[in-house]
Amino acid sequence: MDVLRSIQKEATLEPLLNNIYNRLEKITNSKLLDDKNKVITSFLNIKEYLKKASAENSDFWEASARSFAYSLIKTFSASLLLDHAQWSLENNNDDFFLTISKRFCNQELSPLIYPNKEYIDDSLSIFNF
């Protein structure tokens, strides 16, 4: 919920998404392209989720806030790791950060949930406990 409040209050989502996109555009090293594509897929999943979720009520957002926050931070973190891995390969000819970014990108980067009514009701009962 804190991520959602911050995004709503400070209007930070669009700049963050632009940052991720611009960072990914700069990844050109062939060793990083498969992972770049994974992050792009995650990025597009988040954009699609936002389109669908924009028509939903606050209960939907509250029930899915954690998965949204995790998806956002994992995707952002992956873009940072790829960026640093590319820098390290170009400037130090070092593949240490390549290994780290590959391992990180090997997980589910956008574990978004689309809660149904039952899930929302269960979440509300837990929240109001």
What are these regions, as identified by a protein language model?
Residues 1-129:
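Flavin-dependent oxidoreductase catalytic core characteristic
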